[in-house]
């Protein structure tokens, strides 16, 4: 009975959250139908839904499986002295709550992360339908179409990945903290081998994504507003460019 009640309130919450979007969507459909451009509406809607489902599912998988892996870490680990340690409930009390809430919370986060990614549908649609301009920029020797069609989509993807990985690292570290895989006591921070390896892998992926972001930032020099003229100046090229 409790499970059915929880499911009912969860569904009601989703209906309240997405009701406004459904009304707006229906209004747009009526307008496009009136002017005879329903094919454009259905094409963009299909692309948005596809993006939302793909990125929402990826976000769900990131959160769910990493937290699940942390929650299933071995429990037979040594405990630090409790004099200055963080006061937390025992893993035996936390485990049933984590197991009960993990799936619905991960689904809910995925439902919010998917539409956020889908809001960049125009950039991604241009990315998949880019055409060359036949003119290269003088600094990086890239076709101008890269800056019009590809760079905005790559920047949006980078921002989504940094947010998703950052939240995953925080959720995973907090789970290890609850299960005593990460502890803080008088002798400093203690991590089990399982927690250390898991978190280091996530941080390594995060840093790789950040490195990709710094690489993308170099192309932003062409939009630099420093100096007397708009674009990459002498200082940008010889001082700021890696």
Feature map (PLM): residue ranges:
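Glycine-rich, often proline-containing surface loops adjacent to acidic residues and nearby aromatics
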Residues: 145
């Amino acid at each position: 009975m409790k499970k059915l009640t929880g499911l009912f309130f969860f569904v009601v919450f989703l209906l309240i959250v997405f009701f406004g979007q459904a009304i707006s969507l229906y209004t747009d459909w009526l307008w496009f139908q009136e002017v005879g451009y329903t094919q454009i509406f259905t094409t963009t809607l299909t692309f948005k839904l596809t993006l939302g489902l793909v990125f929402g599912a990826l976000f769900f998988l990131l959160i769910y499986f990493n937290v699940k892996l942390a929650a299933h870490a071995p429990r037979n680990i040594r405990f630090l002295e409790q004099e200055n340690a963080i006061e937390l409930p025992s893993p035996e009390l936390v485990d049933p709550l984590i197991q009960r809430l993990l799936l619905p919370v991960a689904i809910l986060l995925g439902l919010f992360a998917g539409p956020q990614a889908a809001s960049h549908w125009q950039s991604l649609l241009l990315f998949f339908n880019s055409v060359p301009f036949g003119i290269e920029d003088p600094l990086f020797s890239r076709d101008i179409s890269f800056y019009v069609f590809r760079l905005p989509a790559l920047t949006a993807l980078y921002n989504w990945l940094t947010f998703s990985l950052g939240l995953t690292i925080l959720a995973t570290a907090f789970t290890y903290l609850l299960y005593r895989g990460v502890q803080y006591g008088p002798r400093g921070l203690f991590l089990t081998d399982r927690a250390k390896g898991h978190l280091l892998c996530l941080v390594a992926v995060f840093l790789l994504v950040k490195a990709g972001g710094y690489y993308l930032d170099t192309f932003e020099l062409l939009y630099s507003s420093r100096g007397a003229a708009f674009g990459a100046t002498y200082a940008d090229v010889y001082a700021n460019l890696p």
